[in-house]
Amino acid sequence: MGQKINPLGFRLGVTQNHHSYWFAQPKNYSKLLQEDQKMRNCIENYVYKNIRNSSNYGGIARIEIKRKTDLIQVEIHTGFPALLVENRKRGIEQLKTDVQSILTSGDRKLRMTLTEVTKPYGEPNILAEYIALQLESRVAFRRTMKKAIELAKKTNIKGIKIQIAGRLNGAEIARVEWAREGRVPLQTLRAKIDYCYYPAQTIYGVLGIKIWIFQDEK
């Protein structure tokens, strides 16, 4: 069977950009890299606990981190920024406090901004969250995939592939099912392909969701 390389790492520097923008001395590099991951985990956990429920989800497309001499700038790209701002009394301020507590260098200021994604269902992370929410609510997987493809097509993408693996609909034996619409040229480097893996926790076990979205060709 053919093994698939991660499409994001494969195209890094060609059509994909880094999500962390900073330079560091070799002795500090690993510490700052771990700090970046802790900040991302903190933001995702906050959204999962305080915002995500059966009727809506956080909708975070990506988190970009930029470091300067005395400033750390965290930019959250989300399809639904109103959820972060309005859902709780303090909202973004509470999230900023939680992230600040993780930082090891207390002398650096933290600036957090929200950027709205104009076409949220064209982002694989947001689409995967939607699918996971449906599967956790016991909606049939074929119906969920069909609806997700319809939502994605409205954003004028050129192609999409969705794959779900696990005990589908509670079956005894795990299997893999997939659906594709349009072109998804994984071997073409100039093709801008976004990719996401997302686990869904169902009563029958974990389902693995993979989404490839072909945005455009450079």
Swiss-Prot record:
Keywords: Chloroplast, Plastid, Ribonucleoprotein, Ribosomal protein, RNA-binding, rRNA-binding
Pfam families tied to this protein: Ribosomal_S3_C
Highest taxon above the source species: Eukaryota
GO cellular component entries: chloroplast; cytosolic small ribosomal subunit
Family assignment from sequence similarity: Belongs to the universal ribosomal protein uS3 family.
Oligomeric and partner information: Part of the 30S ribosomal subunit.
Protein name as annotated: Small ribosomal subunit protein uS3c
Species, as recorded: Physcomitrium patens (Spreading-leaved earth moss)
Source species taxonomy: Eukaryota, Viridiplantae, Streptophyta, Embryophyta, Bryophyta
